[in-house]
């Protein structure tokens, strides 16, 4: 019998990507690719997942790329536009497991500033019996240490 299940948020329970935001702000996929590979890179975003403040993160990039200021700030201020909604089949599984009495845990890389917003956007996050959110514990996947917190 399964006693507990661990879920991730992004890519498992929710569909999110900065591309959703930048498709509204840039003209082509090529521009988006260039921006996300040279300015707001995955490595830069990972630092927020580890707990760096969005203010510090955006200040750093604006200093390097002053001509991209509005696009950089959009990543922070328009975070909700990076979301494309929940994966309903995954949420259905989550809810079914909850009804069956299975313990549910969330282990996710997320900024401590954005996770409270995610709780508002995704009410199903309140179903978890426990949550480990990278930005709050200052560890992030794929670091094995975060898994030991389960």
Regions inferred by a protein language model and the residue ranges of each:
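N-terminal helical cap/lid subdomain that shapes the substrate entry/recognition surface
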Residues: 2-92, 99, 111-115
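Substrate-recognition "cap/lid" segment bordering the active-site pocket of phosphatases
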Residues: 112-150
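CheY-like receiver
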Residues: 93-96, 149-150
């Amino acid at each position: 019998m399964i006693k507990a299940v661990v879920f991730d948020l992004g890519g498992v329970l929710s569909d999110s990507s900065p591309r959703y935001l930048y498709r509204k702000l840039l003209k082509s996929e090529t521009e988006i690719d260039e921006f996300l590979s040279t300015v707001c890179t995955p490595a830069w975003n990972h630092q927020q997942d580890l707990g760096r403040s969005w203010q510090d993160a955006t200040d750093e990039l604006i200093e390097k790329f002053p001509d991209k200021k509005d696009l950089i700030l959009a990543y922070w201020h328009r975070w909700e536009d990076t979301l494309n909604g929940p994966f309903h089949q995954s949420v259905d599984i989550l809810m079914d497991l909850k009804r069956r009495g299975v313990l549910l845990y969330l282990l996710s890389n997320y900024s401590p500033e954005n996770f409270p917003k995610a709780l508002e956007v995704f009410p199903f996050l309140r179903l978890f019996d426990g949550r480990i959110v990278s930005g709050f514990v200052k560890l992030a996947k794929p670091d094995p240490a975060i898994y030991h917190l389960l």
